[in-house]
Amino acid sequence: MRCSVLVICSAALFAAPVHAQDSAEALRQDIRAVRQTLQAMEQRLDALERAEGRSPASPPEVVSVAPTAIAPAATLRQAASASVPGTGQAILPPRDSVADPSSAASRPDSAAGPTDPELKGFFAIPGTETVIRIGGYAKLDAIADARAAGDEDQFITSSIPVGSAHRDTSNFNLHAKQTRFSFEARRPTSRGNLRFYLENDFFGSSDGYQFRLRHAYGQLGNTYAGYGYSSFMDADSLPDTLDFAGPGGAGYLLVAGIHHSFNWGKGNTLTVAAEDPDSQLAGTTDDTIAVNRLPDVTLTARMERDWGHLQLGAVARSLGYDGDQRDDRRFGGGAQLSGSASVGERDLLLFGVLGGKGLSRYTADLTGSGLDAVIGADGRLHALSLQGGFVGYTHYWTPMWRSNLIYGQLTMARNAALAADAFRQSRYGVFNLIWSPAPSWTMGMELLYGQLEQQDGQRGDTMRLQGSLQYNFIK
């Protein structure tokens, strides 16, 4: 403030018309008068600053800028909460991910996620406390299948053909459907941090590039409402693959719901959620319909530390159908334990195991397959049992090169009411090599193997080679 006043006063004095001086002595008198005026103003400013409780002689703060380097995890986590309003303190160690499911996940107090600890790319709306970001990435996938894989765009093991006449047909595919756009807004409020998140990709149809909604939600404090990840799933445990589908034994579901998290402190939270129900049944006929009379209810306990995290989730469901001759109801539900753990300097171990009855909707391989329960010949509804899981390991060869080794499996119990060609078991294996020469640029190669077994014991398998190029808009 003082420097500004002095500059203005000096400019005004020297800009005034200069009158002719009779002698050098008169000029010196004018200079002394200017000095006295400036000293008087400086004393007055000192008095005003003392009255405001500031030190009159304190110099402006100098912010030093260090050379570009890989910042420690703690520094990155602190930077996000300090620079972006409406953000809680992140805890998990930073990690890389091509699909980056963590960035869209809802978190207590809208904390930064492990794939974006600095929350880069936000800019302020003038005159408000709101900051916004437009993000996403463009991704091109080149895919070569040794045999028919069923789904040409994603490696979904439950869709592998078994006993098909065209089973041995190889295929090449090139697509950019994983390309996505996101919009995010954050701001602090008197009731907690406010976050709005919107995300789309182009997996809306199998034969084109139809826009698909992935996330659309708002979160105030620890209360979430909208459409996005189920509270039951754990986005931070999903492994780093070029393939978009990931292991079939992982918990995965996009659904509308309301969540509320209770923060116990020290990285411990408990989340309760009510989510849109959908009884996905096998054995239905023209005169039977699935009914949903209660929301799916989930309860999730989570522990986060600087070495990783553990999450235990449970879901309870009401499954049912109505028919012309009979109706029936069954309880469904299950649990999942998942987590991550740092190994060495940058390596990471990821895992998840789940099991239950009527849980197919909540798995990556079987969501939408109609295998939560089956209607028997006697009209009774039978909730189908399943177990599954995955494990993944990320190894950094150098700061720019990394590899992932992943295995997943999902198994459903045999049931006489199911069709002979219904799902029995799937296996998923991946090895990849990923190069990220710059934060916004990633490319890699991935080898995938998948196997599907039907209820009658018949099997089919295939191998896929996938290459990907990805450009992140902000990273």
Where are these regions (language model features)?
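Sec/Tat signal peptide C-region and signal peptidase I cleavage site
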Residues: 16-20
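N-terminal periplasmic/intermembrane-space "pro-region" immediately following the signal or transit peptide
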Residues: 21-148
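Extracytoplasmic loops and strand-loop junctions of Gram-negative outer membrane beta-barrel proteins
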Residues: 116-120, 161-168, 240-244, 282-284, ...
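Outer membrane beta-barrel
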Residues: 118-158, 162-280, 291-294, 298-309, ...
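Transmembrane beta-strand segments that form the barrel wall of outer-membrane beta-barrel proteins
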Residues: 193-204, 272-276, 310-318, 402-415, ...
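Detector for outer-membrane/organellar transmembrane beta-barrel domains
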Residues: 304-423
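Outer-membrane beta-barrel "beta-signal"
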Residues: 435-437, 461-475
